[in-house]
From Swiss-Prot:
Keywords from the named record: Biotin biosynthesis, Cytoplasm, Hydrolase, Serine esterase
InterPro entries referenced in this protein's UniProt entry, alphabetically: AB_hydrolase_1, AB_hydrolase_fold, AB_hydrolase_sf, BioH
Binding site for substrate: W22, S82, L83, F143, M144, A145, L146, Q147, H235
Catalytic residues, chain numbering: S82 (nucleophile), D207, H235
Matching Pfam families: Abhydrolase_1 (PF00561)
Protein name in UniProt: Pimeloyl-[acyl-carrier protein] methyl ester esterase
Pathway where it operates: Cofactor biosynthesis; biotin biosynthesis
Segments forming a coiled coil: none
Gene: bioH
Gene Ontology biological process terms, A to Z: biotin biosynthetic process
Family to which this protein belongs: Belongs to the AB hydrolase superfamily. Carboxylesterase BioH family.
């Protein structure tokens, strides 16, 4: 069995890497890939433990990074959704020669809420962790519903996510658990000033997992970065508003 991550590479142009979020896999980007293929050489990966990389595992951001480094292009634009945004930010901080520009999508340097920071309530994360041990299939489906909640097209969004995720092998429970621990524990806020490359932060106005207040807080922490808010989207703007999403990426890449 291969010890390499599953990468799908297609298209022509500057290198652009797409990282999915927790419980998902690279198939979630299909709508985006079809639109961006004429403009970029796209590198879509199944992170360790997910999709066609389900037989692999990584317990930390750096372990994920080490597996990505084996086949990742250098000087690429990195686009990370949700947990994938944490991975992309980690790459930008610790392996900057691979990241020419950084794009985070519905992501946060710290996902768990605390007194003066908006985010996912710790009890929600611990409930997901408990459910995982009972039935990880149902847990992932619940997470999909949570990601789409609030979007006017929530039902269709969930359908699209399910179609994508279930088209590939199921994630392994060990990696799902490790991912939840990262969402609960990782805090990159103090490291953000060390980011040197151009950065674009994309948010869904209706997102229940990464509240829009996070965008305002990060505007102060990252004054040189750009941000855009998708008005009709919840946690998956590239599913809800794919045309607008691709327009933002093309515009940012061209700068």
């Amino acid at each position: 069995m291969s010890t390499d991550l599953h990468w799908q590479t297609q298209g022509q142009g500057p290198d652009l890497v797409l990282l999915h979020g927790w419980g998902m896999n690279g198939a979630v980007w299909q709508q985006v890939v079809e639109r961006l293929e004429p403009h970029f050489r796209l590198h879509v990966v199944d992170l360790p433990g997910y999709g066609h990389s389900a037989h692999l595992h990584a317990a930390s951001l750096e372990e994920i990074a080490q597996q990505l480094l084996e086949h990742a292009p250098k000087q690429a634009i990195w686009v990370g959704w949700s947990l994938g945004g944490l991975v992309a930010t980690h790459m930008a901080l610790h392996h900057a020669d691979y990241v020419s520009k950084l794009v985070t999508v519905a992501s946060s340097p710290k996902f768990a809420a605390e007194a003066r920071w908006r985010g996912i309530q710790p009890q929600v994360l611990s409930a997901f962790t408990e459910q995982l041990s009972e039935d990880f299939h149902i847990t992932v489906e619940r997470f999909m519903a949570l990601q789409a909640m609030g979007s006017p097209s929530a039902r269709q969004d969930v359908k699209n996510l399910k179609q994508a995720v279930f088209s590939r092998p199921q994630p392994n429970p060990q990696s799902l658990l490790a991912g939840l621990q990262m969402l609960a524990e990782v805090d990159l806020r103090d490291h953000l000033p060390h980011l040197t490359m151009p950065m674009l932060r994309l948010y869904g106005r209706l997102d229940g997992l990464v509240p829009i207040k996070v965008a305002q807080d990060l505007e102060k922490a990252l004054p040189a970065s750009e941000q855009f808010i998708f008005t009709q989207s919840s946690h998956a703007p590239f599913i809800t508003e794919p045309e607008s999403f691709c327009h933002q990426l093309l515009s940012f890449a061209g700068k």
